[in-house]
């Protein structure tokens, strides 16, 4: 018997067929989001395979739209993780998605939520990542109601203050945010 949390077995044919079905309806696909961010059994290596296979399939579908999650889920949050570690982790995933020809959805980072000491750390990380991407990205920010490990994201437990920090980053990099 397989443990789906430890022994991931993806039915690639059905997975890609479902993406093709979504594209046939005129819908876009946000790829490798739940799997990469929420720990649903697919690690970063598996997420890369999913992104690659979906991008390959997308190229055969006129008008298909897809963006792929890039985050830091391969970096385990911990007391020794620094903001620089988070930057390197984001860069690794962003570079991988771009190297495959994909568009990026920049996911919130549990490691950043733990390593950051205030809004300035978020500004530092997002400035660096947004300055390095080739094409505009979608910034994806889940609140703590979806992931308690993201409490205080953007350097504040007050959502209005957090949004001000996020909006300042977006404004500073308007050409890099979709």
Where are these regions (language model features)?
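Active-site beta->alpha loop and helix N-cap motifs at the rims of alpha/beta catalytic domains
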Residues: 1-161
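Catalytic beta/alpha-barrel core
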Residues: 105-106, 176-178
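Acidic/histidine-rich catalytic cores of soluble enzymes
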Residues: 141, 163-177
